[in-house]
Amino acid sequence: MAKAYKQAGVDIEAGYQAVALMKEHVQKTMRPEVLGGIGGFGGLFDLSALGYRQPVLISGTDGVGTKLKLAFLLDRHDTIGIDCVAMCVNDIIVQGAEPLFFLDYIACGKAVPEKIAAIVKGVADGCVEAGCALIGGETAEMPGMYDEDEYDLAGFAVGVAEKERLITGETIQAGDALVGLPSSGLHSNGYSLVRRIVFEQAKLSLDEIYEPLDVPLGEELLKPTRIYAKLLRSVRERFTIKGMAHITGGGLIENIPRMLPPGIGARIQLGSWPILPIFDFLREKGSLEEEEMFSVFNMGIGLVLAVSPETAAPLVEWLSERGEPAYIIGEVAKGAGVSFAGGGRA
Protein backbone atom coordinates (compact mmCIF):
# COMPACT_ATOMS: atom_id res chain seq x y z
CA MET A 1 0.00 0.00 0.00
CA ALA A 2 1.28 3.49 -0.94
CA LYS A 3 4.69 2.02 -1.85
CA ALA A 4 5.88 5.07 -3.77
CA TYR A 5 4.72 7.41 -0.99
CA LYS A 6 6.68 5.35 1.56
CA GLN A 7 9.77 5.53 -0.64
CA ALA A 8 9.32 9.30 -0.64
CA GLY A 9 9.49 9.26 3.16
CA VAL A 10 5.83 9.14 4.23
CA ASP A 11 4.70 5.93 5.96
CA ILE A 12 0.89 5.88 6.06
CA GLU A 13 0.83 2.58 7.95
CA ALA A 14 2.99 4.08 10.71
CA GLY A 15 0.44 6.85 11.02
CA TYR A 16 -2.36 4.32 11.44
CA GLN A 17 -0.35 2.51 14.11
CA ALA A 18 0.24 5.77 15.97
CA VAL A 19 -3.50 6.51 16.01
CA ALA A 20 -4.23 3.04 17.36
CA LEU A 21 -1.65 3.45 20.14
CA MET A 22 -2.89 6.89 21.21
CA LYS A 23 -6.59 6.00 21.45
CA GLU A 24 -6.50 4.89 25.08
CA HIS A 25 -4.76 8.12 26.08
CA VAL A 26 -7.27 10.27 24.21
CA GLN A 27 -10.21 8.37 25.70
CA LYS A 28 -9.29 9.27 29.28
CA THR A 29 -9.77 12.98 28.50
CA MET A 30 -13.38 12.70 27.35
CA ARG A 31 -16.14 14.88 28.79
CA PRO A 32 -19.90 14.21 28.53
CA GLU A 33 -20.28 17.13 26.12
CA VAL A 34 -18.04 15.53 23.49
CA LEU A 35 -19.99 14.03 20.60
CA GLY A 36 -18.47 11.17 18.62
CA GLY A 37 -14.97 9.78 18.83
CA ILE A 38 -11.60 10.37 17.20
CA GLY A 39 -11.19 9.81 13.49
CA GLY A 40 -13.78 12.25 12.17
CA PHE A 41 -13.00 15.31 10.10
CA GLY A 42 -13.70 17.57 13.07
CA GLY A 43 -14.23 17.34 16.82
CA LEU A 44 -17.75 17.95 18.14
CA PHE A 45 -18.59 19.58 21.48
CA ASP A 46 -22.12 20.33 22.74
CA LEU A 47 -21.80 23.76 24.34
CA SER A 48 -25.53 23.94 25.09
CA ALA A 49 -25.17 21.09 27.58
CA LEU A 50 -23.26 23.40 29.94
CA GLY A 51 -26.18 25.76 30.51
CA TYR A 52 -24.39 29.09 30.10
CA ARG A 53 -26.68 32.11 29.74
CA GLN A 54 -24.24 34.32 27.81
CA PRO A 55 -21.32 32.08 26.91
CA VAL A 56 -18.14 33.69 25.63
CA LEU A 57 -15.64 31.37 23.95
CA ILE A 58 -11.99 32.03 24.76
CA SER A 59 -9.29 30.44 22.62
CA GLY A 60 -5.53 30.21 22.68
CA THR A 61 -2.73 28.58 20.74
CA ASP A 62 0.91 28.00 21.58
CA GLY A 63 3.81 25.62 21.23
CA VAL A 64 6.62 24.35 23.41
CA GLY A 65 9.49 26.11 21.67
CA THR A 66 13.07 24.93 21.91
CA LYS A 67 12.40 22.94 25.07
CA LEU A 68 11.72 20.25 22.48
CA LYS A 69 15.46 20.09 21.75
CA LEU A 70 16.05 18.74 25.25
CA ALA A 71 13.36 16.11 24.77
CA PHE A 72 15.19 15.02 21.61
CA LEU A 73 18.55 14.82 23.39
CA LEU A 74 17.15 12.88 26.34
CA ASP A 75 14.85 10.79 24.11
CA ARG A 76 12.01 11.47 26.53
CA HIS A 77 8.71 12.44 24.97
CA ASP A 78 5.97 11.61 27.49
CA THR A 79 5.84 14.95 29.34
CA ILE A 80 6.42 17.55 26.63
CA GLY A 81 2.72 17.35 25.74
CA ILE A 82 1.86 18.56 29.24
CA ASP A 83 3.86 21.70 28.46
CA CYS A 84 1.89 22.23 25.28
CA VAL A 85 -1.45 22.01 27.07
CA ALA A 86 -0.23 24.21 29.92
CA MET A 87 0.98 26.98 27.64
CA CYS A 88 -2.40 27.15 25.90
CA VAL A 89 -4.71 26.53 28.85
CA ASN A 90 -2.96 28.90 31.26
CA ASP A 91 -3.38 31.66 28.69
CA ILE A 92 -7.15 31.28 28.55
CA ILE A 93 -7.87 30.68 32.24
CA VAL A 94 -6.39 34.05 33.17
CA GLN A 95 -9.31 35.60 31.29
CA GLY A 96 -11.81 33.54 33.23
CA ALA A 97 -12.22 30.54 30.95
CA GLU A 98 -13.20 27.03 31.92
CA PRO A 99 -11.13 24.87 29.54
CA LEU A 100 -13.43 22.77 27.35
CA PHE A 101 -11.42 21.10 24.63
CA PHE A 102 -7.98 20.88 23.09
CA LEU A 103 -6.46 19.99 19.72
CA ASP A 104 -2.83 19.16 19.02
CA TYR A 105 -0.58 19.39 15.98
CA ILE A 106 2.54 17.26 15.61
CA ALA A 107 4.85 17.69 12.63
CA CYS A 108 7.73 15.23 12.37
CA GLY A 109 10.46 14.04 10.05
CA LYS A 110 9.54 10.40 10.54
CA ALA A 111 6.41 8.99 12.18
CA VAL A 112 7.54 6.52 14.83
CA PRO A 113 4.27 5.19 16.31
CA GLU A 114 5.60 4.69 19.84
CA LYS A 115 7.11 8.17 19.94
CA ILE A 116 3.94 9.81 18.62
CA ALA A 117 1.89 7.88 21.18
CA ALA A 118 4.21 9.05 23.98
CA ILE A 119 3.81 12.67 22.89
CA VAL A 120 0.02 12.32 22.79
CA LYS A 121 0.07 10.63 26.20
CA GLY A 122 1.62 13.81 27.58
CA VAL A 123 -1.00 15.94 25.84
CA ALA A 124 -3.74 13.72 27.28
CA ASP A 125 -2.22 13.89 30.77
CA GLY A 126 -2.23 17.68 30.49
CA CYS A 127 -5.84 17.69 29.33
CA VAL A 128 -6.90 15.55 32.30
CA GLU A 129 -5.08 17.94 34.63
CA ALA A 130 -6.79 20.93 32.98
CA GLY A 131 -10.21 19.28 32.80
CA CYS A 132 -10.55 19.59 29.04
CA ALA A 133 -11.14 16.99 26.32
CA LEU A 134 -8.66 16.15 23.58
CA ILE A 135 -11.14 16.09 20.69
CA GLY A 136 -8.86 16.21 17.68
CA GLY A 137 -5.40 16.63 16.28
CA GLU A 138 -3.08 16.24 13.34
CA THR A 139 0.13 14.28 12.92
CA ALA A 140 2.00 15.33 9.79
CA GLU A 141 5.00 13.35 8.56
CA MET A 142 7.15 15.86 6.68
CA PRO A 143 10.41 14.35 5.39
CA GLY A 144 12.82 17.03 4.28
CA MET A 145 11.26 19.60 6.61
CA TYR A 146 12.47 17.96 9.83
CA ASP A 147 15.26 15.53 10.67
CA GLU A 148 13.99 12.00 11.27
CA ASP A 149 14.30 12.25 15.06
CA GLU A 150 12.83 15.75 15.34
CA TYR A 151 9.30 17.09 15.60
CA ASP A 152 7.37 20.23 16.44
CA LEU A 153 4.37 20.35 18.74
CA ALA A 154 1.63 22.97 18.98
CA GLY A 155 -1.79 23.08 20.54
CA PHE A 156 -5.09 24.91 20.50
CA ALA A 157 -7.31 25.34 23.57
CA VAL A 158 -10.91 26.55 23.70
CA GLY A 159 -12.71 27.48 26.90
CA VAL A 160 -15.87 29.26 27.93
CA ALA A 161 -16.85 31.90 30.45
CA GLU A 162 -20.10 33.54 31.43
CA LYS A 163 -19.88 37.02 29.94
CA GLU A 164 -20.36 38.70 33.30
CA ARG A 165 -17.62 36.51 34.80
CA LEU A 166 -14.87 37.42 32.34
CA ILE A 167 -11.65 38.59 33.96
CA THR A 168 -10.64 41.75 32.14
CA GLY A 169 -8.51 43.68 34.63
CA GLU A 170 -10.67 46.76 34.14
CA THR A 171 -11.31 47.23 37.87
CA ILE A 172 -7.67 46.96 38.93
CA GLN A 173 -6.49 50.11 40.68
CA ALA A 174 -3.45 51.44 42.51
CA GLY A 175 -3.12 49.82 45.91
CA ASP A 176 -4.41 46.42 44.85
CA ALA A 177 -2.26 43.48 45.89
CA LEU A 178 -0.40 41.07 43.62
CA VAL A 179 -0.42 37.43 44.69
CA GLY A 180 2.01 35.03 43.03
CA LEU A 181 1.46 31.31 42.52
CA PRO A 182 4.69 29.29 42.24
CA SER A 183 5.96 27.79 39.02
CA SER A 184 7.30 24.24 38.83
CA GLY A 185 10.53 25.47 37.28
CA LEU A 186 11.42 27.06 33.96
CA HIS A 187 8.07 26.07 32.45
CA SER A 188 8.44 26.50 28.65
CA ASN A 189 10.27 29.78 28.17
CA GLY A 190 13.86 30.88 27.84
CA TYR A 191 15.19 27.59 26.50
CA SER A 192 17.27 29.06 23.69
CA LEU A 193 19.23 30.93 26.36
CA VAL A 194 19.26 27.86 28.61
CA ARG A 195 20.76 25.70 25.86
CA ARG A 196 23.40 28.34 25.14
CA ILE A 197 24.39 28.41 28.82
CA VAL A 198 24.34 24.64 29.30
CA PHE A 199 26.01 23.50 26.09
CA GLU A 200 28.13 26.42 24.85
CA GLN A 201 29.17 28.42 27.91
CA ALA A 202 29.31 25.97 30.83
CA LYS A 203 29.52 22.76 28.75
CA LEU A 204 27.42 20.79 31.23
CA SER A 205 26.05 17.24 31.13
CA LEU A 206 22.30 16.65 31.25
CA ASP A 207 22.91 13.45 33.23
CA GLU A 208 24.82 15.07 36.10
CA ILE A 209 23.35 16.37 39.37
CA TYR A 210 24.84 19.80 40.03
CA GLU A 211 24.61 21.85 43.22
CA PRO A 212 22.10 23.18 44.26
CA LEU A 213 19.85 20.89 42.18
CA ASP A 214 18.55 17.62 43.63
CA VAL A 215 17.91 15.83 40.30
CA PRO A 216 19.96 15.46 37.09
CA LEU A 217 20.10 18.67 35.07
CA GLY A 218 18.16 17.17 32.16
CA GLU A 219 15.32 16.09 34.45
CA GLU A 220 15.17 19.55 36.00
CA LEU A 221 15.03 21.26 32.62
CA LEU A 222 12.27 18.93 31.38
CA LYS A 223 9.97 19.43 34.39
CA PRO A 224 6.49 20.02 32.94
CA THR A 225 4.86 23.42 33.04
CA ARG A 226 2.34 23.73 35.85
CA ILE A 227 -1.35 23.84 34.91
CA TYR A 228 -3.39 26.13 37.18
CA ALA A 229 -6.92 25.48 35.87
CA LYS A 230 -8.41 23.39 38.67
CA LEU A 231 -6.78 25.46 41.40
CA LEU A 232 -8.13 28.70 39.94
CA ARG A 233 -11.60 27.23 39.63
CA SER A 234 -11.61 26.65 43.40
CA VAL A 235 -10.12 30.08 44.09
CA ARG A 236 -12.75 31.88 42.03
CA GLU A 237 -15.56 30.11 43.87
CA ARG A 238 -14.45 31.89 47.05
CA PHE A 239 -12.55 35.05 46.12
CA THR A 240 -12.95 37.93 43.67
CA ILE A 241 -10.01 38.07 41.28
CA LYS A 242 -9.64 41.36 39.40
CA GLY A 243 -6.96 40.29 36.96
CA MET A 244 -4.50 37.50 36.21
CA ALA A 245 -1.27 37.18 34.27
CA HIS A 246 0.36 34.01 32.99
CA ILE A 247 4.11 34.54 33.42
CA THR A 248 5.66 33.24 30.21
CA GLY A 249 8.25 34.72 27.82
CA GLY A 250 9.28 38.14 29.05
CA GLY A 251 8.85 37.20 32.70
CA LEU A 252 7.12 39.40 35.25
CA ILE A 253 8.31 42.52 33.45
CA GLU A 254 6.43 41.85 30.22
CA ASN A 255 3.43 39.87 31.41
CA ILE A 256 2.08 41.69 34.45
CA PRO A 257 1.32 44.86 32.40
CA ARG A 258 -0.82 42.77 30.04
CA MET A 259 -3.53 42.50 32.71
CA LEU A 260 -3.37 46.12 33.89
CA PRO A 261 -5.44 49.12 32.74
CA PRO A 262 -3.63 51.99 30.97
CA GLY A 263 -1.58 54.22 33.25
CA ILE A 264 -1.26 51.55 35.93
CA GLY A 265 1.92 49.65 36.76
CA ALA A 266 3.26 47.25 39.36
CA ARG A 267 5.81 47.38 42.15
CA ILE A 268 7.35 43.98 42.91
CA GLN A 269 8.95 43.28 46.29
CA LEU A 270 12.08 41.21 45.78
CA GLY A 271 12.57 38.58 48.47
CA SER A 272 8.83 38.06 48.97
CA TRP A 273 8.93 34.58 47.41
CA PRO A 274 11.59 31.85 47.14
CA ILE A 275 13.64 31.80 43.95
CA LEU A 276 13.92 28.22 42.74
CA PRO A 277 17.47 26.77 42.65
CA ILE A 278 17.47 26.33 38.86
CA PHE A 279 17.34 30.09 38.36
CA ASP A 280 20.32 30.76 40.63
CA PHE A 281 22.15 27.94 38.87
CA LEU A 282 21.56 29.41 35.41
CA ARG A 283 22.40 32.93 36.53
CA GLU A 284 25.75 31.76 37.90
CA LYS A 285 26.66 29.50 34.97
CA GLY A 286 25.58 32.10 32.41
CA SER A 287 26.96 35.15 34.25
CA LEU A 288 23.60 36.87 33.80
CA GLU A 289 22.48 40.13 35.36
CA GLU A 290 19.41 40.04 37.59
CA GLU A 291 17.52 42.37 35.26
CA GLU A 292 17.96 39.97 32.36
CA MET A 293 16.88 37.02 34.49
CA PHE A 294 13.62 38.78 35.32
CA SER A 295 13.05 39.76 31.69
CA VAL A 296 13.49 36.20 30.37
CA PHE A 297 12.42 33.72 33.07
CA ASN A 298 9.44 33.39 35.40
CA MET A 299 11.82 33.34 38.39
CA GLY A 300 9.60 30.97 40.35
CA ILE A 301 6.23 32.67 39.79
CA GLY A 302 3.99 31.11 37.15
CA LEU A 303 0.80 33.08 37.67
CA VAL A 304 0.03 36.48 39.22
CA LEU A 305 -3.38 37.43 40.61
CA ALA A 306 -4.50 41.01 41.21
CA VAL A 307 -6.87 41.29 44.18
CA SER A 308 -8.10 43.96 46.57
CA PRO A 309 -5.77 44.60 49.54
CA GLU A 310 -8.21 43.02 52.00
CA THR A 311 -8.45 39.85 49.90
CA ALA A 312 -4.73 39.11 49.63
CA ALA A 313 -3.94 37.73 53.10
CA PRO A 314 -7.10 35.56 53.39
CA LEU A 315 -6.43 34.18 49.89
CA VAL A 316 -2.83 33.26 50.71
CA GLU A 317 -3.94 31.70 54.01
CA TRP A 318 -6.72 29.70 52.34
CA LEU A 319 -4.31 28.36 49.73
CA SER A 320 -1.69 27.53 52.35
CA GLU A 321 -4.22 25.52 54.37
CA ARG A 322 -4.72 23.38 51.28
CA GLY A 323 -1.04 22.81 50.68
CA GLU A 324 -0.78 25.40 47.92
CA PRO A 325 1.94 27.99 48.55
CA ALA A 326 1.20 31.55 47.47
CA TYR A 327 2.95 34.85 48.12
CA ILE A 328 2.03 38.52 48.22
CA ILE A 329 4.74 39.66 45.82
CA GLY A 330 3.89 43.33 45.38
CA GLU A 331 1.20 45.85 44.63
CA VAL A 332 -0.39 47.78 41.82
CA ALA A 333 0.94 51.33 41.54
CA LYS A 334 0.36 54.47 39.51
CA GLY A 335 2.55 54.80 36.44
CA ALA A 336 3.28 52.33 33.69
CA GLY A 337 5.67 49.40 33.80
CA VAL A 338 7.03 47.07 36.46
CA SER A 339 9.53 48.21 39.08
CA PHE A 340 11.37 46.22 41.74
CA ALA A 341 12.17 47.09 45.34
CA GLY A 342 13.98 45.39 48.19
CA GLY A 343 16.06 42.26 47.93
CA GLY A 344 17.16 39.28 49.95
CA ARG A 345 15.50 35.89 50.03
CA ALA A 346 12.06 34.68 51.08
Swiss-Prot record:
HAMAP family associated with the record: AIRS (MF_00741)
Coiled coil: none
UniProt keyword terms in alphabetical order: ATP-binding, Cytoplasm, Ligase, Nucleotide-binding, Purine biosynthesis
Entries under Pfam families matching the protein: AIRS, AIRS_C
Name of this protein: Phosphoribosylformylglycinamidine cyclo-ligase
InterPro entries: PurM-like_C_dom, PurM-like_C_sf, PurM-like_N, PurM-like_N_sf, PurM_cligase
Compartments, record wording: Cytoplasm
A biological process term (GO) from this entry: 'de novo' IMP biosynthetic process
Catalytic activity line of the entry: 2-formamido-N(1)-(5-O-phospho-beta-D-ribosyl)acetamidine + ATP = 5-amino-1-(5-phospho-beta-D-ribosyl)imidazole + ADP + phosphate + H(+)
Enzyme class name: ligase
Origin species: Geobacillus kaustophilus (strain HTA426)
NCBIfam families in the cross-refs: purM (TIGR00878)
